[in-house]
């Protein structure tokens, strides 16, 4: 009986304090920057970060970084090999480690508002290496940065 009560108490604590176990905003944003824009220059990485931030502050999307990034069918980088590598930074090769550190720095600066939005409010993007998605035809193009084209949903 005592074990059962302890287990229930632990479960209750987990439910009440799930943010303790959730990824912090900087880490989860850095992961998606790394996974989606590892081959991009600084501005390309900043642009990907801003799309996530724009979604967090939009009424059309979830209001947390983690929920925006994990929203189904949104970011192909989630659960990619690059995404998974960020859980084990000591195993990153020197080039990947530099890119991961850059992603962390960019994530922090974007979240803190120290870098302006180069996408002009974009909340979507796609890579130029794929055919134009149907959704892009219904949106306003805001920028082309590196290998991504950025779009803003209609208000």
Identify the role of each PLM range:
Residues 1-7:
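Bacterial N-terminal signal peptides that target proteins for export
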Residues 23-155:
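Bacterial extracytoplasmic/cell-wall-associated proteins, especially those involved in peptidoglycan
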Residues 1, 22-23:
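Initiator methionine at the very start of the polypeptide chain
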């Amino acid at each position: 009986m005592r074990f059962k009560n302890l287990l229930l108490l632990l479960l209750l604590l987990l439910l009440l304090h799930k943010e303790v176990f959730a990824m912090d905003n900087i880490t989860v944003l850095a992961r998606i920057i790394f996974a989606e824009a590892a081959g991009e220059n600084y501005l390309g990485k900043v642009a990907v970060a801003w799309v996530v931030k724009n979604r967090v502050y939009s009424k059309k999307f979830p209001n947390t970084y983690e929920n925006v990034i994990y929203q189904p069918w949104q970011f192909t980088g989630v659960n990619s090999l690059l995404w998974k590598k960020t859980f084990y930074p000591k195993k990153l090769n020197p080039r990947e480690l530099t890119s991961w550190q850059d992603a962390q720095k960019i994530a922090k600066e974007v979240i803190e508002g120290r870098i302006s939005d180069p996408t002009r409010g974009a909340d979507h993007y796609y890579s130029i290496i794929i055919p134009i998605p149907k959704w892009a035809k219904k949106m306003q193009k805001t920028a082309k940065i590196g290998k991504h084209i950025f779009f803003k949903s209609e208000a």
